[in-house]
Structures are given as structure tokens and as C-alpha cells.
């Protein structure tokens, strides 16, 4: 069933891929992005584009008035750099929390009652056990994770008070290309693309932060393909709305170490990847792996790419876009 959807932050990596999937499924899509990060080139053909900031309440009201009867909103607009959030926490509270507050107000005023929120595993902080289930304690260790958790609490309140039907999807480490289309995180901070930049000669080496974890070598993470992630968002936004806030972790349920990722990049690219050993970064957990049972049960989601083949199509994109996208429209 086709519909009309607003994608905030839809010129960024994940948001642009989700917008593309929505367009290809026959939906009318409006992308909203301020382009402080992200790239205009990432907005898929067939989607309308509004350049503006979700914190601007007048702008948001105009977007909703100009596009009557949005069937739902998929919300990606957020700052997401953990390190920056530690030194500039106010930036994250203002944008991630304040921006979502303005979005919820605009949705309420327009009678839009369906929301999918792009959340993060950072809301859980240091896990007590893995795989991580949705009922796990939420104790974020940085302002970025705290800001996302605050948004989750806001959404829960909105659902109870005003009948919002919402799904939050905390996901873990996303990578890969989507049928040849991949944007870059801006600025890049994720392991797989950083290692691929070493293979391209754009970086001299990859820093490995600690090899003294209680793992076979280095810390272990759950990697999810961006196309699988996009499919989960589409399934979530199609759920029947109601005064409920559902949280569904998205991941493959298995983990790979930093060393395994580096070795895979060496094999796929044929390039040596020099490593620089560095101390652990603060409170980096040894293992972060998701339990996606709720997403499977409630959304009918089944990821189709559960191994490091994710590296191959990411390398294909990086090889054809050696400098990434360099326009901001």
C-alpha cells in the first residue's frame, strides 16, 4: 500500500537509503534536511526536497500545511558524533531533543499519528548481558546516547497523551551500499568505511583501540546492512498506528571483532591495511550484539545479510566514489 511520508534527515546515509526504498515502493516521499551534514546528491530521484531545520517551528508548520495527509514520518535528523557530544553536549540537547519536540508538535497539529524514530544502541550504554534485548537497562555513557534516550521518553509520553503510534528502532553498526548507492557519514567515524579509506590510500593506517578485551582479540560489534535496515523502517512505518510506542532492536545477532573486519577488508580489496595499536577508548564495551527477536515478531523483519559480505558492496561504492560526494546542494 502506497502512502505519503516525510523523511527528516533524508539526505544522510541511512535516511537517504530509506527514502530510496520508499520511492521504489511507490510512495510519495518528502525529504527534509538542513544539509549541515549529509549531501543533496543523496536525495533520491522522485522525492521532493525541503531544505530547512526541524527546530524551526514556523518552517515545520509550513511543511505539514503544504503536504496534507502525511501517512507517517520517519525521523533521522540528529547529530550523532559520540566524541563531539562529550565536549558539546548542549548541541545535542538542542538539536536532537529540541528538534524532535518541534517535530512532534508539528505532527500533532497536522493530525499525523505515525512515527518511526531512528534510535541507537548507545541508549543502552554498558550492557549487562548480550545479546541486548529491549528490556535491558538504559544507561547511556555519553550525551549522544542520552539525547536519543530522552527522545524515546518524549515519544512514549506523546503516545500515551495524544495517541501517537510510534516505533523506535535502535540499531548497532550499519554499513554497506544499497544497489550501488551509498553516502558517507559526515564526518566519517564508522569502522568499515574508515578501513576502506586506508585501502584507498586516503588514510595511512587504521587505529585499533585496545586488544586486551575478554574476546579472542579486539572488541566485537554487530554489523547490519543498510538495505536490511531500510527494510525494517518500511515495515515499521506500515504498522497500524495507535497509542503505543514499540521499541525494536535491529541487528544480526552475531558479532565480528575489529581484527576480523580489518582482515576481511584486506581480503576483499587486496590492499595491506596497516594497524596502529592505541589504548582503549574510555568505556568502550567489549561486546555489543543485538537481539532482534522483537523486530522479527512484531514487524516480520528478517535480515538477509548476516556476514561480512557487507564489506564487498561497500568497497564497490568507495572504489567508484574515491572522494565520496562533495556537493551540499
From Swiss-Prot:
NAD(+) binds at residues 13-14, 33-38, 53-54, 76-80, 95, 120, 144, 148, 172. Involved in the metabolism of galactose. Catalyzes the conversion of UDP-galactose (UDP-Gal) to UDP-glucose (UDP-Glc) through a mechanism involving the transient reduction of NAD. Its EC number is 5.1.3.2. It catalyses: UDP-alpha-D-glucose = UDP-alpha-D-galactose. Belongs to the NAD(P)-dependent epimerase/dehydratase family. Pathway: Carbohydrate metabolism; galactose metabolism. One of its GO terms (biological process) is galactose catabolic process via UDP-galactose, Leloir pathway. The active site is at 144 (proton acceptor). Keywords: Carbohydrate metabolism, Galactose metabolism, Isomerase, NAD. Homodimer. This is UDP-glucose 4-epimerase. NCBIfam families: galE. Its cofactor is NAD(+). Substrate binds at residues 120, 144, 173, 190-191, 207-209, 221, 281-284. GO terms for molecular function: UDP-glucose 4-epimerase activity.
Amino acid at each position: 500500500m502506497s502512502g505519503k511520508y516525510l523523511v527528516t534527515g533524508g539526505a544522510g546515509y541511512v535516511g537517504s537509503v530509506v527514502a530510496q526504498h520508499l520511492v521504489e515502493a511507490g510512495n510519495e516521499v518528502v525529504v527534509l534536511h538542513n544539509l549541515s551534514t549529509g549531501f543533496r546528491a543523496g536525495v533520491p530521484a522522485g522525492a521532493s526536497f525541503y531544505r530547512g531545520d526541524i527546530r524551526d517551528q514556523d518552517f515545520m508548520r509550513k511543511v505539514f500545511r503544504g503536504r496534507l495527509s502525511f501517512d507517517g514520518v520517519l525521523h533521522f535528523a540528529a547529530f550523532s558524533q559520540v566524541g563531539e557530544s562529550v565536549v558539546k553536549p548542549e548541541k545535542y540537547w538542542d538539536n536532537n531533543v529540541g528538534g524532535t519536540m518541534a517535530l512532534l508538535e508539528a505532527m500533532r497539529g497536522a493530525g499525523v499519528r505515525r512515527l518511526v524514530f531512528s534510535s541507537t544502541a548507545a541508549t543502552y550504554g554498558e550492557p549487562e548481558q548480550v545479546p541486548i534485548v529491549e528490556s535491558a537497562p538504559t544507561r547511556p555513557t555519553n550525551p549522544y546516547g542520552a539525547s536519543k534516550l530522552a527522545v524515546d521518553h518524549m515519544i512514549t509520553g506523546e503516545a500515551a497523551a495524544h495517541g501517537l503510534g510510534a516505533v523506535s528502532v535502535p540499531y548497532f553498526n550499519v554499513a554497506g551500499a544499497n544497489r550501488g548507492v551509498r553516502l558517507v557519514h559526515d564526518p566519517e567515524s564508522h569502522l568499515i568505511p574508515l578501513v576502506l579509506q586506508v585501502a584507498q590510500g586516503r588514510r595511512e593506517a587504521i587505529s585499533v583501540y585496545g586488544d586486551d578485551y575478554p574476546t579472542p582479540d579486539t572488541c566485537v560489534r554487530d554489523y547490519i546492512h543498510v538495505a536490511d535496515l531500510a527494510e525494517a523502517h518500511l515495515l515499521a512505518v506500515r504498522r497500524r498506528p495507535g497509542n503505543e510506542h514499540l521499541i525494536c532492536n535491529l541487528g544480526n545477532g552475531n558479532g565480528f571483532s575489529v581484527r576480523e573486519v580489518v582482515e576481511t577488508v584486506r581480503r576483499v580489496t587486496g590492499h595491506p591495511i596497516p594497524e596502529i595499536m592505541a589504548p582503549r577508548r574510555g568505556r568502550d564495551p567489549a561486546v555489543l550484539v543485538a537481539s532482534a527477536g522483537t523486530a522479527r515478531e512484531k514487524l516480520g523483519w528478517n535480515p538477509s545479510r548476516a556476514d561480512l559480505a557487507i564489506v564487498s558492496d561497500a568497497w564497490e561504492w568507495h572504489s567508484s566514489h574515491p572522494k565520496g560526494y562533495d556537493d551540499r546542494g
